Amino acid sequence: MIDFEFEFQYAEAKLPSLRQIGGSIPAGRCVVLCGGSGCGKSTLLRCINGLIPQFYEGELKGFCRLNGQDTAGMHIGEIGELAASVFQDPRSQFFTVNSSNEVAFGLENLGLPQETIRQRVEEAFRVFHLERLKDRNVYELSSGERQLISILSAWAMDTDIFLLDEPTANLDFVATRQLKEILLALKRQGKTLLLSEHRLYYLADIADEFWVMADGEIKGEYTATEAKAFSAEQRQTISLRTLDLAEISVPEKEPLPKTAATALAVSDVRYTYGRKAGDTLS
């Protein structure tokens, strides 16, 4: 369960980023923060996970309770044991190069017995059917695969709350679909999910509520049923993107005029990533 009430203004900023914002998310529910860039979605998540004020400086007022525990005075690591954070670019939160070691990293910092860590890591890959990602170089994985590893790392810590900041920002359609399956699994396990997102269609079957933010405030809270029932005009009025993938269209581009006989020419180019066998490009 998440309960919060905040006001926050970044150091050197002229205006507050959050204005008397508050909310309550019952255990096992999924809430999606949506709204335009700069509306305060990421700032709200930072206030909840302790990055504000422990990493990002500014004037913070209010409170946050995670599963009934007041986070005031807690070290950021203690907050992390209550709520796991997953960021836009998982590379920014990796501490090791090996995927299995990355999942084990947080458990090692808790000082758990080696056998307990081994079992928990094995369980993480098995529960989510991601054995193919074991013992891989994280920098040879796709963006989607790296995002999955970051979620496994969070799950291995056995937290009940997951905070995800635009988790599909760097993902393609296939990777987004894989992430959706992981989030569905977390929801079935009774985890509490709070996400900030621009891309909403993949959350149509996961989210319980959509909270629309603007100017550092929550302007509207809508159930998934209400959000799905909105017309295109209603969604545009409240700045809510479509939840139906069929409504998303890609405009056709007109071919560029030829300004020269040859725009780009290459020959005899070969490239291989790291130690990967064979040529990646030839």
Regions found by a protein language model. Give the residues of each.
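Conserved ABC ATPase signature
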Residues: 137-141, 145
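Hydrophobic anchor residue at the start of the ABC signature
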Residues: 151
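ABC ATPase C-loop
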Residues: 154-155
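Catalytic Walker B motif of ABC-type/P-loop ATPase nucleotide-binding domains
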Residues: 162-165
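H-loop/switch region of ABC-family ATPase nucleotide-binding domains
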Residues: 197-198
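Conserved beta-strand-loop-alpha-helix hinge in the C-terminal portion
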Residues: 217-240
